[in-house]
């Protein structure tokens, strides 16, 4: 797996104006996975009708 440091060198750093948002941007790719898990929890709650 590519480490965060190598990925940053490959894609470049964020412009300085966006540096405060860096931790948020690191979490954003996880959001679609959370929606997928939410779908399973929802179906389990309604017993997979």
Swiss-Prot record:
Pfam families: PsbK
Keywords from the UniProt entry: Chloroplast, Membrane, Photosynthesis, Photosystem II, Plastid, Reaction center, Thylakoid, Transmembrane, Transmembrane helix
SUPFAM superfamilies tied to this protein: Photosystem II reaction center protein K, PsbK (SSF161037)
Membrane topology per record: Single-pass membrane protein
One BP term from GO: photosynthesis
Localization (cell): Plastid, Chloroplast thylakoid membrane
Assembly, per entry: PSII is composed of 1 copy each of membrane proteins PsbA, PsbB, PsbC, PsbD, PsbE, PsbF, PsbH, PsbI, PsbJ, PsbK, PsbL, PsbM, PsbT, PsbX, PsbY, PsbZ, Psb30/Ycf12, at least 3 peripheral proteins of the oxygen-evolving complex and a large number of cofactors. It forms dimeric complexes.
Annotated protein name in UniProt: Photosystem II reaction center protein K
Designated gene of the protein: psbK
């Amino acid at each position: 797996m590519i480490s965060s440091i190598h990925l940053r060198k490959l894609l470049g750093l964020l412009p300085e104006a966006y540096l405060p948002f860096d931790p948020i941007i690191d979490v954003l790719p996880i959001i679609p996975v959370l929606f997928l898990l939410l779908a399973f929890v929802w179906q389990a709650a309604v017993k997979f009708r």
